[in-house]
Amino acid sequence: EIRDVVSEDTIVVSIAPGKKLAWMEGLFEKPLKIVRTMPNTPALVGEGMSCVCGNEKCSSEDVNTVCRIFAGFGKTEIVEEDMIDVVVGVSGSSPAYVFMFIEAMADAAVADGMPRAQAYRFAAQAVLGSAKMVLETGKHPGELKDMVCSPKGTTIEAVRVLEEKGLRSAVFE
């Protein structure tokens, strides 16, 4: 639809997952500046994590312009194109996994008698605070996990159950 209206100095920004820069270049009859991006849904609340990658026609200033736009709804990093599909799994799709985890924690709290709205607040805040600890302390997530686990405690028991049930392998797959 935009093929006939874009000029060679226009930066075309794509959020289409799985569509490579070369494929997008083939859609146009003239060489254009194309930036491939992958935002995620936390951008809706200003906490998105997006990646950007420009084609050979893009200057670093072109790519930085797109980064500044995307910074308006979260953080942005420049990546090589072969990393964009990796970003889909680790950032683009992962909010759904986190929502499932929050829901499961809240369901467990509800099963123990906590009102659902309160359970969601506790579970979501725990995830938010934990994420901030990873980002702000610079400590390895395993080290932070170990800080919560005490010998023969309820947390290490819960970690054992999560390991037995295959949390890591499910995420890794």
Where are the model-predicted features located?
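A short acidic, helix-capping loop that chelates divalent metal ions and anchors anionic groups
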Residues: L44-G48, V86-V88, E157
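Glycine/serine-rich anion-binding loops at beta->alpha junctions
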Residues: M38-A43, V88-V98
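Short pre-catalytic strand/loop immediately N-terminal to key active-site residues, enriched for Gly-Thr
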Residues: I34-V35, I84-G89, P141-D146
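Alpha-helix N-cap/helix-start capping motif
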Residues: P17-G18, P39, E81, P95, ...
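Internal alpha-helical scaffold of NAD(P)-dependent oxidoreductase catalytic cores
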Residues: W23, L27-K33, M49-V86, F99-E136
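NAD(P)-dependent Rossmann-like dehydrogenase/reductase catalytic/cofactor-binding core
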Residues: A124-E173
